[in-house]
């Protein structure tokens, strides 16, 4: 996305066709924070949104860490329609997956082998140290 204002008081934007996820100057990768499972208000619409979002993540090569917290951990539950897409992301892009142990416990969700259950303190430190953080909420 490029900002092309015609005057000082006007903002216009030019959208690129392809998704742009820029790395920081030091080559750092993007940290993706998923805080919501999108199923609460409209199941079908929420599932379609999250699957589409995860499908877009699958097409990128610079997601280094995925953090799941709050109801976002519910996408790890058996039978979740997003679990297969998340598995594809893990198999192709190999990001590190951190799950909030408090959230896993609250929602009764098990942490899969490809992820690491960590305390909320570790989650917050990871978020604070992230140079490029994208939040899905």
What positions do the PLM features span?
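Cysteine-centered metal-binding/redox modules
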Residues: 123
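A glycine-rich helix N-cap at a beta->alpha junction
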Residues: 82-108
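Long, charged alpha-helical interface segments
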Residues: 111-113
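SAM-dependent methyltransferases
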Residues: 1-32
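Short active-site-adjacent helix-start/loop capping segments
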Residues: 75-77, 106-109
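C-terminal binding/interaction regions
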Residues: 117-118, 126-136
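Conserved mixed alpha/beta catalytic, RNA-binding, or beta-rich assembly cores of soluble enzyme
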Residues: 20-80
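General beta-strand structural signal in soluble alpha/beta enzymes
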Residues: 68, 98-100, 134-137
